[in-house]
Amino acid sequence: MTDIGRTKSRNYKCSFDGCEKVYNRPSLLQQHQNSHTNQKPYHCDEPGCGKKFIRPCHLRVHKWTHSQIKPKACTLCQKRFVTNQQLRRHLNSHERKSKLASRIDRKHEGVNANVKAELNGKEGGFDPKLPSGSPMCGEEFSQGHLPGYDDMQVLQCPYKSCQKVTSFNDDLINHMLQHHIASKLVVPSGDPSLKESLPTSEKSSSTDTTSIPQLSFSTTGTSSSESVDSTTAQTPTDPESYWSDNRCKHSDCQELSPFASVFDLIDHYDHTHAFIPETLVKYSYIHLYKPSVWDLFEY
């Protein structure tokens, strides 16, 4: 089928003024219109969560992060982890914090004694109301006064120009879902037919530096269920090797070159096929957190 034929088959046009987006399925049109109004009708029902998403595939990915089995519990703070490696790293952070806090207390007490002695020698004597904080700035002392106080592993968001940094136990996947995936995208120039098939938000811009640049897209439209079936027909026995080539496994994309990163590949699946394979999300989790691969998949 030609590109013209595919364009004519898109009968569902966005009704927002100035928007020319057209889709071949009413569900994609509704998801696109949600981006105009910032409506997020897909709610997480996990107790205490309440996160909301524009598209159902985003909710499915998010709910997977809740369903992770974390059998390794810290006896000091009750945080839970997937692997022994994660737990050991976390326990080491407790030990480092304890040692550093002791050094801070000893050093801080010595500095305060010197400050008090100096003030006692001045006219007016020592003011007992002086904050027992940093002698340099007069503020209450906090961990933030010392860079590197918490030297646990940190994770930088992989999206360009995003300064988000999460601690080891935070969920970077959810940050990416809420702030990047399906919200900002650079559409390759020179092919206006692509712009008709991609759900975008009012904030999307071809000059947005937080976008993933120059992704490759398929212009064929298939339903979410068809896309899932065509990909999950090959259930990977080893997700690490299955996705490590950063290639789309969809039958329509076999000729595409590998994507620059696993995050570009996730973005491609989301925008082109309207779903994200669960095993790809698990692989990206491995890519971010670097635990033992089989520890993560043994459930």
Curated annotation (Swiss-Prot):
It is found in: Nucleus. Residues 200-232 have a biased composition (Low complexity). The keyword Nucleotidyltransferase does not apply. Changing D238N: In strain: MMW1-15h2 and MMW1-2h2. Pfam families: zf-C2H2, zf-C2H2_4. A motif (Nuclear localization signal) lies at residues 96-107. GO terms for molecular function: DNA-binding transcription activator activity, RNA polymerase II-specific; RNA polymerase II cis-regulatory region sequence-specific DNA binding; sequence-specific DNA binding; zinc ion binding. InterPro entries: Zinc_finger_trans_reg, Znf_C2H2_sf, Znf_C2H2_type. Present with 2120 molecules/cell in log phase SD medium. May function as a transcription factor. This is Zinc finger protein FZF1. It comes from Saccharomyces cerevisiae (strain ATCC 204508 / S288c) (Baker's yeast). The gene is FZF1.
